[in-house]
Every structure is written in C-alpha cells, then in structure tokens.
Amino acid sequence: MFGVKDAIFKIKRSIAGTDSSDSTAYTTASESSPQLKDSHNPFRNKTTSERTIVEEGSLPPVRLNGYLPSTKNKLLTPEMCDEIRTLMPTRIQLYTEWNLLYSLEQHGSSLHSLYSNVAPDSKEFRRVGYVLVIKDRKNGIFGAYSNEAFHPNEHRQYTGNGECFLWKLDKVPDVNISEKEESEQEGKEGKEEGDKEERWRFSGYPYTGVNEFAIYCTSEFLSMGAGDGHYGLLCDDGLLHGVSNPCQTYGNEVLSKEGKKFSIVALEVWRVG
C-alpha cells in the first residue's frame, strides 16, 4: 500500500550495507564542495550512512497539518515535500505527517515565539526531523533541514549533526522531450509561453564534513552552516531579514533569489513525524 513495503525493504537493505547512500538522484553541490574530512570523522560517519534515496513513487504521500483556513502564505505543498525529503534519513522519509509548529503569519514575527513553538514535548522520544522554509521578496523558496529542534544556545556551541542540510526549490518548465519531438514532427505549434507547465527543481546541499558548524542559534539569531566568517543561512531575531552565503559546512550556493541579503516575507517550521 503506497509502496510502504518497498520503502521498508530499502531500510533493511540500507542497514545491511548493500544500498548506495549518497545517490545522485537529486541536485547537490557536493561535486564542487571543499574536500571532505577523512573517514575517521565521527560526526560524519554517524549519519551519512543512513541517508538513502527511495525510488520515486515508492513513498506514501505527505499530509500537511496546521494551516488555518485564513492563512494566506502557505509555503509548502505535498509535491514540494516529496522533493525536500529525498535528502532526509530513510526512516524520516517514511513519515507521512508533517506538522506546522511555527508560521510567521500565524504566530507573529519573533524568534522567541519560534523557539517556544518548536520546543519538543519532554515526553516525546521518537526520532523526528525539522524543516525550515523561507520565502523572500522575489518568491524564492529555500530553507534547511535539522535533526533537532531549533533552540537558543548562549554558550557559543554548535549543535546538530551530519543529517542537516540546506536546500532551495526553483520553478522550471516541465518539458516532456518525447511530446516536444512529436509536436515538431507534426508541425504543430507549441504552447504559448504563459501556458507552459512548471515543476519544482530541488537543489540540496548536504553536510560536507569539512567542519562541524551545523546549527548555531542564540536569542539574537538562528543560523545553519558557517566557515571563513560567513553563515550558510541566518535569520535575525525579528525574522524580518536574513543572510545566505556559500559556506564550508554545506558547500551551498546563495539560497535566496534576492542575493546574500534578503527580506523574509514568510517563514515556517515543520516537524516531520
């Protein structure tokens, strides 16, 4: 049912060590990233072996919970979730329930409110994931995945592990090559520019192993990734402005369409599982 057996089989195969962890079924910057640390890096070995790309169509569909009927800025759709979860650990990919913990529109623009809303229940011991989603003024959609809830750490300590990653989604034309060739052969006119269908193209930037600056949050900002004095992604305490730079932790590109500095139009945090 929904290919769940397929996915469970892949988990067993992953545990047995017979699957290929870092598949190229998604777009990443790993080829251009700085050289990874050696295989003795415990921070890296702890997580990357668990990451598997499950075959398309074999995962159960995602259900999004938490949007109010009055919410105007709804940043995610199940189709977008399918793209984002390709880089998650296999067991997290299998969760069908994505629960909205924080929304800039629904809960107000405050980093303190974000931390309060995403704080896990002390009785909850199940392993889950967290997805940060941001929309900028040019309608760019990007964000991050975290293995733990975002929380302030005033001791200048980085948290998180090698499961974390940065990502962005771009709308691109959905071109069917076979249909295009058939149309050209028959001499038919193609669709008008405005009628072209589009799809989401996912670009993921997984942990490189170069450093261990996965997550760093304080009462003044939330950030993921760093190196050479630059943050991969940073949001200020008012959740009004942010910064995105290429960083060593994730080998990422600038995530926002606005450039290295961007304005936050909408922001959400989801719990996966």
Swiss-Prot record:
Region annotated Disordered, chain positions: 18-48, 177-197
This protein's record includes keyword Mitochondrion: yes
GO CC list: cytoplasm; mitochondrion; nucleus
Ranges where the TLDc domain occurs: 74-273
Residues with the N-acetylmethionine modification: M1
Source taxon at top rank: Eukaryota
Keywords: Acetylation, Mitochondrion, Phosphoprotein
Function description: Involved in protection from oxidative damage.
Family matches, as PANTHER family: MUSTARD, ISOFORM V (PTHR23354:SF62), NUCLEOLAR PROTEIN 7/ESTROGEN RECEPTOR COACTIVATOR-RELATED (PTHR23354)
Protein name as catalogued: Oxidation resistance protein 1
Species of provenance: Saccharomyces cerevisiae (strain ATCC 204508 / S288c)
UniProt lineage: Eukaryota, Fungi, Dikarya, Ascomycota, Saccharomycotina
Gene: OXR1
